[in-house]
Amino acid sequence: MFGKLLTKIFGSRNDRTLKTLGKIVTKINALEADFEKFSDEELKAKTAEFKQRLESGQTLDDVMPEAFAVVREASKRVFEMRHFDVQLLGGMVLDSNRIAEMRTGEGKTLTATLPAYLNALTGKGVHVITVNDYLARRDAENNRPLFEFLGMTVGVNIAGMGQAEKKMAYASDITYGTNNEFGFDYLRDNMAFSPNERVQRPLHYALIDEVDSILIDEARTPLIISGAAEDSSELYIKINTLIPHLIRQDKEDTEEEIGDGDYSIDEKAKQVHMTERGQEKVEVLLTERGMLAEGDSLYSAANISLLHHVNAALRAHTLFEKDVDYIVQDNEVIIVDEHTGRTMPGRRWSEGLHQAVEAKEGVHIQNENQTLASITFQNFFRQYEKLAGMTGTADTEAFEFQHIYGLDTVVIPTNRPMVRKDHADLVYLTAEEKYDAIIKDIIDCRDRGQPVLVGTVSIEQSELLHSMLKKAKIPHEVLNAKFHEREAEIVAQAGRSGAVTIATNMAGRGTDIVLGGNWNMEIDALENPTAEQKAKIKADWQVRHDEVVAAGGLHILGTERHESRRIDNQLRGRSGRQGDAGSSRFYLSMEDSLMRIFASERVSSMMKKLGMEKGEAIEHPWVSRAIENAQRKVEARNFDIRKQLLEFDDVANDQRQVVYAQRNELMDAESIQDTIVNIQADVVNGLIDQYIPPQSVEELWDIAGLETRLEQEYALRMPVQEWLDKEDDLHEETLRERIVEIWVKAYKAKEEMVGAQVLRQFEKAVMLQTLDGLWKEHLAAMDHLRQGIHLRGYAQKNPKQEYKRESFELFQQMLESLKHDVISILSKVQVQAQSDVEEMEERRRQEEAKVRRDYQHAEAEALVGAEEAQALAATQPVVREGEKVGRNDPCPCGSGRKYKQCHGKLS
């Protein structure tokens, strides 16, 4: 209450921000009359003047009012469009590392031209990031005339472009592209072998369109570049035949009784768990098929791979539904984005899940992949010096934007007042009653000439409605993952009188629905249209527009509430653009997944007690509140998963930054001879210390072991024992000096034989290739570590701390291996001439050609149990089974080493 009183007196934080920025808008407006008098040449010359002022020490804030006024004037001349004051506000918010929430139809694309131009003046490049290739190309082509008028270059960065094209795109002042492509290019640049293979400049300013979709919905999806691993398609096919034999458990296990069934499903967590009975049944089935030895357990260390395949197949059959989570097209399983309803060709689920789904559907099973490089969008975008974004719906996620990215959200007022009517939800008992009511509403709107946009949450729903409308003989268009080739055309005409459009998750479609239809697209369809033709098309459109407004504008009809309130708001936001008339209503049933999983049974029983007859609906604020609370629960849980994924990825990110920085340093260096000399000294001394411990007596020296290692790993034959037998004055230090001296001489001889330049090139190639190979193995080790780390909670340990500690140990081991492997290769390999180095490079290129890009879904299942396990760590007492192992006793693992030098190290 006190907070509300303060807000009344001082205004909200948002109001205060807008008030401050409003003063700058007044300054920009004051400049308009002066700039209108400028000739085109004088206006264009302002770009060079701004650049000069920045070089002489002024800041972007100093030139911003004039720069925005210049862009507004140029837009009036090039597009015949003037930036509204609210668009100037949006531009300022985007320039100040914040997120601008601008309603649909308020001109986000035009708003983006202001900060894009301003930040391009620095010469460091601006990346305007959209959700798909179509929007990137469209926005680049639409805005190119304006930017080129002002002397700026524009590039487009989309999938399938060659290296030279990408370099040119990144060298442009303003580069449009998709989030995937910018992320992949970053990873590819960090896998390059020479500086001229890199395409990106340092990451300066990113302006993200549909920022909530990219920074929140896709935050659980790391970008992964991977290479094919071994073929295990036969195994997936065999395991797939087991699943139909398993039965789902009807009720959960309790302390009193064990539920019947082989597996249980946790729909909230999207997890499936095998019961003890299920495990026994799977073991019997595997034994019958000769895949498991008689009496062997599925959970033994040797059968971990089998268990992994069984779990993947079980998830594929129980949690992933055709035409909801994926579609089958051209003998291929293609993922459907749950947030936008778009298909995502080229993306694959990780951890063998995609192959399991392919086996389930009987299509060609593609090989599993090995990760070569990966990064989450969260960590990629946090590398930009400046980051900003715009969307129609950000306020519900404002906390996450601030907490994860440090970005404040500012809600920009609409240019004209919003007049859309948002009706209360109608809740029915069954889905059948709900769909009947939806069809009646559609018919009613169509009879009045009101266009209807029906939003569904899955392809399955859209196809059900499609068949019902077909049966009712109602003409309509369907827009879903199966038919998005005609997307722009369908959306453009969705505002015509009586039009009925079914759309799966309308979010991110990128084309505004104009009441009466899109007259611009009609003009674009004509070749060289005359002024008369344009005038006629516009006049006809005006008549249609007025008819639709009189009928009530665009009516939004939601068939189900989405897990996220934001997606519902995006659907609603398609209506009522720029002060247009419009309305919206959601139809729900107690059989909807959100209601079934999260809304309490009390709602359902209350509806039954009310004695509701078939076809009756309940419309009550209490029910709407219950639904909103259910959505809040899901949003909070999803936020926790994203936050947890980020906490784990931050550990990997620190290591990634070190490796990539070191890699770029090596690649840019003319010669890495000094680095090789230092590594060589470390390796030699480490090796000698291992076999001749410092300040130790001769009896502890393992000379035979030292001679063997020197010969096997470093191709150096040294009769160390012979020297010691013959030379009495040879002690530890003089022996060390002699070994180092011979080693250095052998390497010098190699250099004299092939030439210093060839050896320097070879050193660099070996160093980079060895680093890449070890980094690849390290990523796989980190994946395995992360997948099982939550189990540490059951051993009273904090999974996050354990992950940090063990991943650091793995990283240290990788760096040690790098030193030894590089020196071993350089010592053993005989380089004959330049052709050997070139052959090595050619082999690398051939390997690289086999590498495919994968945009894999890592839904963080491995982390879901971490918090639960962590809680257990705090509450469960320590119970030791068996005798305590002494520090000097042999390790129980059977390695032959002392416990303190083996597994005792970790305890």
Swiss-Prot record:
Documented EC number(s): 7.4.2.8
Catalytic activity: ATP + H2O + cellular proteinSide 1 = ADP + phosphate + cellular proteinSide 2
Statement: the UniProt record of this protein carries the keyword Ion transport: no
Cofactor: how bound: May bind 1 zinc ion per subunit.
Positions contributing to ATP binding: Q87, G105, E106, G107, K108, T109, D512
Subunit structure: Monomer and homodimer. Part of the essential Sec protein translocation apparatus which comprises SecA, SecYEG and auxiliary proteins SecDF-YajC and YidC.
Protein name: Protein translocase subunit SecA
Biological source species: Shewanella loihica (strain ATCC BAA-1088 / PV-4)
Gene designation per UniProt: secA
